């Protein structure tokens, strides 16, 4: 069925998601014992017990039916209530065994040219399932495959998704560590990286002030850092980064954020006219001139000011949406919905 996600839940049949449509792929409902035993097989004998204790599980699972085939999944297991009893839902997200090539992602030329900074931070943002990890994996593959790359690449992920075993790397080496299996947190991962002389650090998600702060420190000391963030837009990304810190630190941190930022990409996957999904991107490449412009911003105006800079120097989401609508790749309904969201966000900045 070309499924991207598979869901097992106590008291329900098996569901699969294919191009945004949820499909029932079995008639029989699963018992709690079946779901628990499946989780224990994937995670270990204490998997279901951990769920019952109120702690969810994020991990990966790999299945090899033979030497030539390999299937990988990102797995989340969470406790839930079904008919008044404790139950479990397991979500499997399929991961291609080989990272994609950047040439397969139809990235814009100005963006491609900016994705290998010598130092500073590249933020890839968007909702869950918007292709952030896929884009980062393509960037890493592209850099690692270069004959003269000479990069020690360290990744810290929760869980590890794409692997690079099948990629020819003439002059680079990749080490992937899983949080919390190998290190307790993303922030600990960044601190670990600084002791290993890397030429590229990937931080799976900047979800807290400690991780964001550690990534900034790594960038300030001359390292290129790539990370993801859950935000909706370039302007929203800067606002979220600044607001993640206590109010008394916000002004100083805003300066550090702007000094270290190199690229922000906001990506969405939307329905395409061929029944599949297509990536739309908003992005801004922060050169020295743009960083100087934003350093003059007042703290409370950073989001609105960034949006003005984006319109003049970057690619707003509305521009990419219009391009793909004119090319017949997305429907008028999808296009109008995206434009409406953009107008609402801009109105919010003006309030």
Regions found by a protein language model. Name each.
Residues 1-351:
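Short, flexible helix-loop junctions that flank or precede catalytic/ligand sites
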């Amino acid at each position: 069925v070309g499924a991207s996600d598979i869901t097992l839940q106590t008291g329900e049949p098996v569901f699969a998601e294919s191009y945004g449509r949820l499909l029932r792929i079995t008639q029989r409902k699963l018992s709690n014992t079946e779901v628990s035993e499946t989780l224990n097989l994937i995670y270990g004998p204490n998997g279901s017990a951990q769920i019952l204790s109120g702690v969810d599980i994020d991990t990966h699972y790999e299945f090899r039916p033979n030497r030539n085939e390999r299937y990988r999944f990102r797995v989340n297991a969470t406790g839930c209530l079904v008919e008044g009893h404790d139950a479990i839902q397991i979500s499997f997200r399929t991961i291609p065994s080989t990272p994609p090539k950047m040439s397969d992602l139809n990235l814009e030329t100005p963006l491609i040219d900016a994705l290998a900074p010598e130092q500073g931070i590249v933020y890839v943002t968007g909702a869950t399932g918007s292709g952030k990890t896929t884009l980062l994996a393509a960037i890493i593959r592209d850099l690692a495959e270069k004959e003269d790359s000479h990069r020690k690449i360290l990744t810290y992920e929760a869980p590890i998704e794409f692997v690079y075993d099948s990629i020819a790397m003439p002059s680079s080496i990749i080490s992937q560590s899983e949080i919390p299996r190998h290190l307790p947190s993303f922030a600990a991962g960044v601190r670990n990286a600084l002791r290993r002389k890397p030429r590229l650090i990937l931080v799976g998600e900047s979800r807290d002030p400690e991780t964001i702060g550690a990534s900034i420190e790594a960038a300030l000391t001359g390292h290129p850092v790539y990370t993801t963030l859950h935000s909706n837009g370039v302007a929203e990304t800067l606002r979220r980064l600044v607001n993640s810190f206590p109010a008394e630190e916000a002004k100083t941190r805003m300066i550090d954020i702007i000094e270290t930022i190199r690229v922000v990409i906001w990506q969405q996957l939307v329905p395409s006219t061929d029944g599949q999904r297509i990536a739309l991107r908003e992005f801004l490449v922060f050169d020295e001139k743009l960083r100087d412009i934003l350093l003059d911003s007042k703290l409370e105006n950073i989001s609105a000011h960034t949006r003005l800079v984006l319109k003049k120097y970057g690619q707003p989401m509305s521009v990419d949406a219009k391009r793909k609508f004119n090319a017949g790749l997305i429907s008028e309904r999808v296009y109008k919905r995206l434009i409406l969201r953009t107008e609402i966000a801009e109105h919010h900045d003006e309030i």
